[in-house]
A protein has these predicted regions:
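Extracytoplasmic copper-binding redox domains, predominantly the cupredoxin/blue-copper superfamily
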Residues: 1-170
């Protein structure tokens, strides 16, 4: 859990649920994820369903790339030192949370979050995030953090108004 001096939490996934159409995806169709210094970088990665990418191993030792999810993307494959593995778009089937681990190095852990909507962002080092181009309406704000779990709260967006939202997680 990475908490800033102001109490903000890094790597919180924030999504607005219930918007039927609107802005284009900000999350790229292609991604890159690295194993570097026996850590997954970045620790939390936002991906799009049916996206594709590459998993790198920048370390001088081999790793085991193992994902666990509820039908989103599951793989268990060794990656040699200084090698890469392609992720095909058909593999990330749907939106959901994907736990990433290395069975050879138990301290290595990370997360992929396959976003359901383009209205999804990841909080920065200070715990801040920004979601733009939200049409006026009533929605659900869905917040997820790996240790603190999930929180859902109501959100009302009025035309032409920016909102500052404080989310409390326990």
């Amino acid at each position: 859990l990475i908490v800033s001096s102001s109490g903000g939490i890094k790597n919180v996934v924030v999504s607005i649920v219930g918007i039927k159409k609107g802005k284009k995806w900000g999350i790229p169709k292609k991604f890159s994820y690295d194993q570097n210094g026996c850590r997954f970088v970045p620790h939390v990665l936002l991906v799009r369903p049916k996206s594709k990418g590459v998993v790198l191993n920048s370390d001088n030792v081999g790793h085991n790339f193992h994902t666990v999810s509820k039908g989103v993307y599951n793989i268990n494959k060794k990656i040699k030192a200084n090698a890469k593995m392609k992720v095909k778009k058909k593999k990330i089937k749907k939106a959901g949370i994907i736990r990433v681990k290395c069975d050879l190095h138990s301290w290595m852990g990370g997360w992929w979050v396959a976003a359901k909507t383009p209205y999804t962002e990841l909080s920065d080092e200070s715990g801040k995030f920004s979601i733009s181009d939200i049409p006026p309406g009533k929605y659900k704000l869905k917040i997820w953090q790996e240790k603190l779990g999930e929180v859902v709260q109501d959100l009302v967006i009025k035309a032409g108004e920016a909102q500052n939202i404080t989310i409390k997680m326990k």
